Swiss-Prot record:
Organism whose genome encodes this protein: Mus musculus
Gene Ontology process terms (BP): cholesterol biosynthetic process; cholesterol metabolic process; cranial suture morphogenesis; inner ear morphogenesis; middle ear morphogenesis; negative regulation of fatty acid biosynthetic process; negative regulation of steroid biosynthetic process; response to fatty acid
Null mutant phenotype: Knockout mice with a conditional deletion of Insig1 in the liver and a germline deletion of Insig2 overaccumulate cholesterol and triglycerides in liver: despite this accumulation, levels of nuclear sterol regulatory element-binding proteins (SREBPs) are not reduced. The amount of HMGCR is also elevated, caused by impaired degradation of the enzyme. Knockout mice with a germline deletion of both Insig1 and Insig2 die within one day of birth.
InterPro entries given in the database record: INSIG_fam
Maturation and modification: Phosphorylation at Ser-151 by PCK1 reduces binding to oxysterol, disrupting the interaction between INSIG2 and SCAP, thereby promoting nuclear translocation of SREBP proteins (SREBF1/SREBP1 or SREBF2/SREBP2) and subsequent transcription of downstream lipogenesis-related genes.
Motif (KxHxx): 219-225
Protein name: Insulin-induced gene 2 protein
Ranges that cross the membrane: 29-51, 71-88, 104-126, 130-148, 154-175, 190-207
Residues joined by cross-link Glycyl cysteine thioester (Cys-Gly) (interchain with G-Cter in ubiquitin): 215
Keyword Transferase: no
Site residues by UniProt (Required for the recognition of 25-hydroxycholesterol): 115
Length: 225
């Protein structure tokens, strides 16, 4: 190359650490948005199932009236779903125990189907008493965890989510923020913890699968570079 010629300036590349952090942050935001909309969708679907039994977490006209007293329930469910879905893989990494049991999308879809089925059963099946109903739902919820999760961290988080969500829900009801459309409050209270537990396991599985897919994409990009 002649001395008079000058090299054209090349675009500066970010360091690998900055690039990695930026990529991870964007991926976390994308996963959070996806989980949020999944949570909103499931909240609306499950509410339609519960309408069959006249037991809903928000009035049936919530979509038609933006001034409904519980219009905020679906967004809250979406936010909780995003937090849970991001928390599960984070806890797995923190404990150094990556979840590898049934890590494919077909298993996740079956988990979602079983979760919806449990909710459908709670709306359709009649039991002699609330204790029998609660025991059946508890067995189904634990069966969902055993079939699609089997991790100690998943079970512990599921129990914690069920307890916290049930307490928050009852506090909102007691304070008159919103109320159930069914007069049988004991019936509602009997299935809430089981549904919250199964919902936590389901969203945790979705979050883990999204995180694993993200890791695969990042690994493929690093190999190409």
């Amino acid at each position: 190359m002649a001395e008079g010629e000058t090299e054209s300036p090349r675009p500066k590349k970010c360091g690998p650490y900055i690039s990695s952090v930026t990529s991870q942050s964007v991926n976390v935001v994308i996963r959070g948005v996806v989980l949020f909309f999944i949570g909103v969708f499931l909240a609306l679907v499950l509410n339609l199932l519960q309408i069959q039994r006249n037991v809903t977490l928000f009035p049936p006209d919530v979509i038609t009236s933006i001034f409904s007293s519980a219009w905020w329930v679906p967004p809250c469910c979406g936010t909780a779903s995003a937090v849970i879905g991001l928390l599960y893989p984070c806890i797995d990494r923190h404990l150094g125990e990556p979840h590898k049991f049934k890590r494919e999308w077909s298993s996740v879809m079956r988990c979602v189907a079983v979760f919806v089925g449990i909710n459908h059963a709670s709306a359709k099946v009649d039991f002699d008493n609330n204790f029998q109903f609660s025991l059946t739902l508890a067995a189904l919820s634990v069966g969902l965890w055993w079939t699609f999760d089997r991790s100690r961290s998943g079970f512990g988080l599921g129990v914690g989510i069920a307890f916290l969500a049930t307490v928050v829900t009852q506090l909102l009801v007691y304070n008159g923020v919103y109320q159930y459309t069914s007069p049988d409050f004991l019936y509602v209270r009997s299935w809430l913890p089981c549904i919250f537990f199964a919902g936590g396991i389901t969203m945790g599985n979705i979050g883990r699968q999204l995180a694993m897919y993200e890791c695969k994409v990042i690994a493929e990009k690093s190999h190409q570079e």
